[in-house]
Amino acid sequence: MAAAGCLYRRTSRELWTILLGRSSMKDGHQIKAELDRYGDRLLQGLAYYRPPSTSSTGKVKANKNLSPALQELGLRLSKFLGLDEEQSVELLQTYLLYDYRGTQESVKGVPQDERQSQALMLKASMVDYYYEERISLLRCVLYILNYFQDDKHPYSAEFSKCVEMMEQKELFGKYLKQFESLCREEAPTWETHGNFMTERQVSRWFVQRLREQAMLLEIIFLYFACFAASPSDLLALTKLFKEQGFGCRLQNRHLVEPSMDPLVERIGYFSVLIFLEALDIETLMTCSLSDKTEQHPFSSEEQVCKEMDSVLVTLGDAPHHGPVLLAWALLRFALNADKVTPTVRKMGSTAIQLHIFQYLTRMLQSLRSGENNCTTSTACLCVYTFLTFVLTNLEEQVLQSQQDLVDTAFQVFAAPNLPDLFWNMEPTAGLGILLDSVVGMFPFHLSPLLKLFTALVSKSSAKKVYSFLDRMSSYTEHYRHKPHDILSHEDETLWKRQTPKVLYALGLGQTNLRIPQGTIGQVMADEHGFLVRWEYSYSCWTLFTCEIEMLLHVVSTADVIHQCQRVKPIIDLVHKVISTDLSIADCLLPITSRIYMLLQRLTTVMNPPMDFLSSCVDCLAALATRMPAKVWIDLRHTGFLPFAANPVSGHIISTEGMNAGGYGSLFGIEQSQGEYSITLSFLRLVTTLVKGQLGSTQSQGLVPCILFVLREMLPNYHRWRYNSHGVREQLGFQILSLIHAILNLSPEEEESTSTPNLQSLCIFSLTNTEAGQAVINIMGVGVDTLNAVMLTQAGSSGTEGQGQMLMQTIKLAFSITNNVIRLKPLSSAISPLEHALTQHGAHGNNLIAVLAKYIYHKYDPSLPRLAIQLLKRLAMVAPMSVYACLGSDAAAIRDAFLSRLRDNIEDMQIKIMILEFLTVAVETQPGLIELFLNLEVKDTNEGSKEYSLGEWSCLQVVLKLIDSQDPESSWGAPLLHRSAIAFLHALWQDRRDSAMTVLRTKPNFWENLTSPLFGTLAFPSESSELSILETCAFIMKIICLEIYYAVRGSLGDSLKKILKKFSEEERFTYWSNYVHSLVCQVAESEGACNSLTEYQQLLSAWRMFLMVATHNADVMHLTNPEVRQKLFKDVLGGTQALLLVPRSMTCLHLGSMLCTVMIILLRRWKSDLAAPEDILSSLTQILEGVLQKDQQLVEKTKARVFAALISALEIKPMKASEIPQYPQLVLNVCETLQEEVVFLVDHTRQEVPANDASEDKDSMETEDTGRIRQKDQRDGVCVLGLHLAKGLCEADEEGDQWQQVLRKLPVLPMLFSALEVSLRIKQNLHFCEAILHFLFTLAKTHQGAAAMAGAGVTQTVCLPLLSVYQLSSNGASTAQPALSLRKSLDAPSWPGVYRLTVSLMERLLKTLRYNFLTEALDFVGVHQERILQCLGAVRTVPSLACLEEADHTVGFLLQLSNFTKEWHFHLPQLIKDVQVNLCYLCQACTSLLHSRKMLQHYLQIKNGETMSSTATPRGQRTPQTPSKQPTAESEALELRQLRSVQHSLLKILGKTLATLRAFTPDLCQILQPLDLAQYNLLFALSFTTPAFDADVTPSFGTLLATVNVTLSMLGEMDKKKDHPLGQVLGETNSTVDNKNIKSLLLFIMENCFYLLISQAVRYLRDPSVHPRDKQRMKQELSSELSTLLSSLSRYFRRGGPSSPAGGLMPSPQPKGASAAKVVPEAQEPLIQLVQAFVRHVQR
């Protein structure tokens, strides 16, 4: 906008908002500055708005900052409004800036667009804005006058100085002139104000003028209440009031419409009040009591008094004149009774005839109907003073009806403090006279006294009222004729009773009153008989009880209506007493206990007394605030409330079986009559009972009541008939208040019953029935309708009235909907409520748009805040686009949101809620957040896109909020700062790259963002603002996300400097200390802090910060070992402090969080941490503390502590004696395992379906990970406990400690039982693997192995292990998955379980030998098919899994081969099959090692690569498509796979050959006499190298080929370091060392030679072999071995390593190192052996 920058003056509405405390300006100094700056405007009042002038027109036209179109529109507006041209332009600018409903971009075009310009005036939007500005200005003055003397108001001192200034500068004179001007102003016409001034506009102008007149008079009245008025001022006012007829003879009265009557009446009322207040009656009464009337101002103003007489003498034809005439007449009489003229006497009599007390009652009722504020209280005080003056100076009989006086007093005493003022006065003066009068007529006239006392009850006077009525000293009754049992005085002025009299004709035993014999009574005769006042003392409360009893007696007679009229004031009084002072409730029990019977009986009469019943229900509602349970129980027996005929079901869909009770019949009558007093009382009662937090059983009884409200009232109340204005709004408010109270009940404990509680009933009904639509309709009223109602309400304060009631109802609807969405159970189906909330309407007519437009509401900031809160909730949970719902209004609404966010006086809570809404929108509303981000895109020369912030981008505001140097930043408002940082965190968390890129480039962004991290935080207390902790937490998370997203080299220099500064200024240490202190505070308070949310946020962020720092130590400069030790020490100490606190879920949760980061630090910083002994000691204490808690709550925590212990044990190898409290730690771990394993087994048995067995698959070719059950997790307690037990077991080298534990606890039987169950049903994979790892470690010691064997390990696993690998029922097996895609070989799998079991058998056999031989043979016998299948599968499935199983299997067979005789005895056929399969296995391994191309072929097939169907030449590769061209990464992966497979084949080959040695004769024995039958011929007599794909019997050629392969590999490793195998095996990162590989190759070679020689000698000594074959064997073998010997000699001459098994060879050992150096090949035992054999063969 062109001149937006010129706006510097605050609008009157803004000023009013500031004074109300609804802005961000809360400090008294700020309020004082505003009042100083705009005090002159307040003093001028409406005169601030000047009329048009020629000079002003010239200034506007000369202003170069204004566009011509804006000047023109401003001048037209000036003529239309009759306002100064400059002010008109300024008004137009502020309207376009604050209230225009379009985008700020479109504002520029409004003045140029004729259609839009006309719309501003024709649609009255500009007019409304101007009128509101005028009213707001007067409201500011009113507000200041109301509260400048109120010490409780926070700005009373500032207001007082402002009032002092205005009083000095003659506020009254200025405002009186304004009032005169308004009274005499001519109505505008189209000639004077332009063509836009239509009749409707004139009518609106007149309404505005009436409202302004009323407010000016109200200001003058309040001014006179504080400052004395001079007689001349009163005279001038009186003349003016007479001129305009106290509002009845207005200048433009032809414009008055019926709707304006309340304003006209209000003008008259304030005119009268000003007159009464200006008379200063209180001073007059004080002067009269002291006989110093000459001190009154009017006593010396005789001329003014005469003029006043002449002015007032003509009055008397209107009700407004009554109080004026009477007050003036009494003043004249009090000042000088002797000089009272007949004119004055005539005024008095005229006033009495005008029914002044009825008028005063109507006046106070009218003032209080719209609002109940300071003005009303001041008016009541003024009338109270007037009544006191009248009653003091006039006889009561002169004042006509006593009832009118009582009615007026009832209204007067409704003001606070006036009842106390009355009780502190003399009882014989003023209204005390009235009290004495009504007491004299009690109980003949029952109502006046009760009504008066009902008004006199206050918090401080309730007990006085009770005591007064409890000690009544007279009883007045009426007699038509003189009774026969009376003795009378001669003049019949005194009577005396000769007999006692029972006052109430009640039954025997009932409460009653009895006038005793001899009682004296004063007689007052009247035209209807005798009125006798007996001198009889009694309690009125007893009398009231008798009256209620009498009503119960006459319920079914014609007297019931009359008796109800007598009893209703009693009930009203009791209600007021109980609601004011609950401590008196017990004393009133005889009365309140009878109300239930009244309800029960009167509900069923023909024409129930509705008002009376309403009072009864109200009384019970007041009583329920103190004793809700008792009221509910007693009320339930009456049948008044709705009830369920049948027990309440779990899901209430309809009201079937519900009875509306007595209230239901009354409800029908009320609907037909259009009056709803009982319904309102019913709602108040039920709300009170709900808030009373009844027990669950009693709350169930309220379900029918709530259901009645939800099904019958809420959906239909807006369609009912109403006789009175405003009742519908009250009903809606009460219904929603009840629902709101239910939804805000504290959650009850879970119960086993299926009956619904009140909350679930409300949630179900609102989400699935018409009740929810009714709430939506209330929210859908819209901001325009609400603003219109606010503008038309008659009250002057703007804070009370009909508009306020509607606003509160809408706010309740917002809160209810928000709570329903928050509390409703999760469901995949969309409920009708959610559908209605999110459905798209035509032309933007949908609820989302309506909610968003509440941002335009300016009166109460809590309304738009609640609307935005609901929008936020919907954006979180509803599957819809808010942006789409807003339609074409989206940009305008965005600008409105950002305008309020930018406004420096805007309420802080709205700003916070807007930011929270945007924070949610980042994740859930992509379209909307892009609209708010408003990023502008530019294409750079490089072809990339460059982003910048648009003018209306929310990031502009956020950057300003976090800028510590900006005076308007949020640094003074911690909650707002936190919300801004939270929004930025959402951008990083959702990875909004464009926004992040723009923010990174902003200067000082990282400095401003991270500033809080470098400050010094005060230690938090209960009263401190803790949002700074959340702010710091979000900042830490943003830094973590930035480091995580960005490549190290791409971090901005600014952030790098910040991180370096963070390290250099020792902020790691500072924050570690701070977080540690918070943790210790929580631990000391046992989790009872009020700030746990903030603490948890900071702790979570610090945890993330440390995790990122451990992985990016160089980036975050966390490399100092001392700092690392300090951080870990604090984390460990905090964890220990929290987890040692008993019975605190909070401490447990926080401790578990810290435990996670402790595990990471342990693993990442092993080398920097202190001795593990101290860490283990603390962890042991933590574990003991955790084990003392409820085990169902600490499962995850136990797992984390176990993981920490495992990591601590891995810091360095330790012996059991070095581990602190080792025995106790082992015992704790085993006891925990015992409990957890039992639970796991029970859980497994319950959860496993019956058909699990049919789903098992063959695991030979698959890595079946199984289905991980909920309790069988990799990081579960059982699994980690077993791994910890394994680590502890490794530390106990001797096994003594574990032996003791195994004797003390049944650990092994329990583990074996769990393992057996898990294996049988093939569940708990991780658990099974962990057990086997633990058992494998335990079996290293002889004691552990013996214990396992004794506990029956073989019986446990032998048969159940079959289910791990058996085929499914269809017998099919699945293909091996791609090697590069499947998990690591170490990942948990069922084949892995089988492999571990085989290894365990091997370890046990190795440790126990003959003691375990029988079990080992049993195991082999059971699994022989699997063993043989595994040995043969290497040829067809050369995958790592298959090779690994073959490796374990051959290893086990190697150990078992030490017992060949026993094996042959028990399993003769199996041993033969094993021998054959081992030979074939040897041949398969040799072939695969020999043909690397074939091995790669297999690997490529496993990886899914396409191969040619025909065999390709050895030197060629199959052409690949361009998409499959090999890359460096794929080649490296292929080499690693090749290395792994070759290494596995070599290990298998070595173990296979070593095992076969047990089945061939020993070289030392074979030359001696030997039984050859016990050794089978293993290899065929053939020397041909076998082909891989041919099923050829293993032969000598196989062994020779093996030697050739090993020799070739050794040569390649030495010659070609760049050979693929050499490269792979020689990598520094490889797990296989080059030296070990060479040793393994030599070991294979030795065993080949050994087998070759042994089998050759076996052939030579076998008589069954033909001599010709023996000779051929000698020749072939001699030739082959000679060739191999020469190759071996060359290898050893090059420096090859000696045989690893040289000591086992029969050839002599080398004698010294020097000999070996001279002729190394001659000294090699292997060569010597082969040479000896060659010589033997050649002989």
UniProtKB/Swiss-Prot annotation:
Residues 1506-1528 have a biased composition (Polar residues). Its main location: nucleus. Belongs to the Nup188 family. One of its GO terms (molecular function) is structural constituent of nuclear pore. Part of the nuclear pore complex (NPC). InterPro entries: ARM-type_fold, Nucleoporin_Nup188_N, Nup188, Nup188_N-subdom_III. The keyword ATP-binding does not apply. Disulfide bonds: none annotated. One of its GO terms (cellular component) is nuclear pore. Keywords: mRNA transport, Nuclear pore complex, Nucleus, Protein transport, Translocation, Transport. This is Nucleoporin NUP188. Component of the nuclear pore complex (NPC), a complex required for the trafficking across the nuclear envelope. Required for proper protein transport into the nucleus. One of its GO terms (biological process) is mRNA transport. PANTHER family: NUCLEOPORIN NUP188 (PTHR31431:SF1), NUCLEOPORIN NUP188 HOMOLOG (PTHR31431). Residues 1249-1269, 1506-1530, 1696-1717 are annotated as: Disordered. Residues 1254-1269 have a biased composition (Basic and acidic residues). Pfam families: Nup188_N, Nup188_N-subdom_III, Nup188_SH3-like. Transmembrane segments: none annotated. It is found in: Nucleus, Nuclear pore complex. Disruption phenotype: Morpholino knockdown of the protein causes abnormal heart and gut looping.
